[in-house]
Amino acid sequence: MKREQLIQNIEKLKHIMPSYVLEYYQSKLTIPYSLNTLYEYLKEYERFFSWLVDSGVADVDKITDVSLSVLENLTKRDLESFILYLRERPRLNTRSTRYGVSQTTINRTLSALSSLYKYLTEEVENEDGEPYFYRNVMKKVQTKKKSETLASRAENIKGKLFLGDETQGFLDYIDNEYEKTLSNRARSSFFKNKERDLAIIALILASGIRLSEAVNVDLRDLNLITMVVEVTRKGGKRDAVPYAPFAKTYFERYLEVRSQRYKTTAKDTAFFVTLYRDVPSRIDPSSVEKLVAKYSQAFKVRVTPHKLRHTLATRLYAQTNSQVLVSNQLGHASTQVTDLYTHIINEEQKNALDNL
């Protein structure tokens, strides 16, 4: 979704929200939460507050009028009814989802509500320096995580990683072979953004940064001499992330054409830009997702930018055998999330031994 459209959608949702949700939104902007995250949270709040009104839990006619006391006095049973509503309503009212929304969707909804409740019961201050209320019913609700072993996750993901020579092979394919699959019209469009697209993909493959971190990189953030890119991690923390040398040439090629092709000036600080009606702007995450999907599907298998991040992490662990180093590279506080990469590498080593 384009940034302009995203902002418009957010404004529409803000218009129907209670005042305390708007306070929450403003507070999270200062951290900062990304606009995409806040948009997803606002959509969850719209669904929740609509249920409060429609079910009669809140004795009001509009979402805007749902008071703080409704949230304060919401019971565990009320929330369980809401969860059942999420599970059952799609089955009753649509043909596309036979068994209701997924557990992942429910967990996302509850996560958004937990964030709002934490703000209202712990973070916000009224005139007396106290939170709006203290009772947090979300602490009584358990979420069910998807049950999957590391072996299963590794098996599902390893076919979508560009390991070994495939990392450079993927970039070479985009650079030299992809155009041969296109019509003359499509080829012209491809050439307009070829250097930029290669630079974006190379950055993620060489550093493992998140999609949101990549699109928010500014010109001043990327150092071609030290081969370090500065990013804003989750929670608003700044981090200096080294990137692999193979990406440098793609950055240089993109910078050679950036100002002329995208008509940028000194005020256009975003590293990755797009041009619409002769006006340059920062590229948005959905555009990157689409271009990664397009190129990867033509090369081998359709993947997401997050799979490119997994690719870097797996390759880095294969070279270092250090979960701490991989965790630092990815911006994780714990090494627990890197267990997956050790399992993938163990499987790759086993397969290599089998072929001896």
From Swiss-Prot:
Q: In what residue span(s) does the Tyr recombinase domain sit?
A: 169-354
Q: Where in the cell is it found?
A: Cytoplasm
Tell me where on the tree of life, at the top rank, the source sits: Bacteria
GO molecular-function annotation terms? DNA binding; tyrosine-based site-specific recombinase activity
Q: Name one Pfam family in it.
A: Phage_integrase
Q: Which residues does the UniProt record annotate as the domain Core-binding (CB)? A: 16-121
Keywords of the record: Cell cycle, Cell division, Chromosome partition, Cytoplasm, DNA integration, DNA recombination, DNA-binding
| Regulation of protein activity | FtsK is required for recombination.
Q: Which InterPro entries match?
A: CB, DNA_brk_join_enz, Integrase-like_cat_sf, Integrase_catalytic, Integrase_recombinase_N, Integrase_SAM-like_N, Recomb_XerS, Tyrosine_recombinase_XerCD
Q: Tell me, which GO biological process terms does this entry list?
A: cell division; chromosome segregation; DNA recombination
| Active-site residues, as the UniProt record annotates them | R210, K234, H306, R309, H332, Y341 (o-(3'-phospho-dna)-tyrosine intermediate)
Q: Which GO terms describe its cellular component?
A: cytoplasm
**PANTHER family xref list:** PHAGE INTEGRASE-RELATED, TYROSINE RECOMBINASE XERC
The similarity comment for this entry is:
Belongs to the 'phage' integrase family. XerS subfamily.
NCBIfam families cross-referenced by the UniProt entry: PRK05084.1
Its biological purpose: Site-specific tyrosine recombinase, which acts by catalyzing the cutting and rejoining of the recombining DNA molecules. Essential to convert dimers of the bacterial chromosome into monomers to permit their segregation at cell division.
What is the name of the protein in this document?
Tyrosine recombinase XerS
Native organism is: Lactococcus lactis subsp. lactis (strain IL1403)
Q: What's the source species' lineage?
A: Bacteria, Bacillati, Bacillota, Bacilli, Lactobacillales
Q: Which gene encodes it?
A: xerS
